[in-house]
């Protein structure tokens, strides 16, 4: 394990986007290092079935919350995905869940494209996905 982040590359079945448990791993790493004050160094990266994604913590110590690695969160997220993924796709489904259900802020989603460019994927207040190229 990298001291600042975690990479997840084992695919037992097609994985399309992060889950609450992945968010929990990120939050736990940050919580352990809460006194460092430099939260921008923490991330979780995964190779998903539709690309490589990174979650990066961009919040403050007030945004650190753990406890999302439970079966209850897993089951609820699976049900949520069954309802919304066909309509919204996985990026929008995940970001909506993060904002509306988990009520988390201070976490940014990035997609590493096949041409090695990186886009920050954000959700507007009108629930539209915006992909902003990173410099």
Predicted segments with their positions:
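Active-site-proximal loop/helix of nucleotide/amide-processing enzymes and allied scaffolds
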Residues: 1-135
């Amino acid at each position: 394990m990298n001291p600042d982040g975690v990479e997840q590359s084992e695919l037992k079945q097609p994985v399309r986007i992060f889950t609450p448990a992945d968010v929990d791993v990120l939050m736990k790493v940050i919580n352990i290092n809460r006194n460092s004050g430099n939260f921008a160094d923490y991330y979780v990266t995964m190779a998903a079935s539709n690309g490589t994604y990174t979650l990066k913590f961009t919040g403050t110590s007030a945004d650190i919350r753990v406890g999302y690695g439970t079966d209850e969160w897993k089951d609820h997220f699976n049900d949520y995905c069954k309802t919304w993924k066909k309509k919204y796709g996985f990026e929008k489904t995940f970001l909506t869940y993060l904002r509306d259900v988990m009520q988390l802020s201070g976490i940014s989603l990035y997609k590493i494209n096949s041409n090695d460019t990186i886009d920050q994927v954000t959700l507007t207040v009108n629930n539209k996905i915006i992909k902003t190229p990173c410099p």
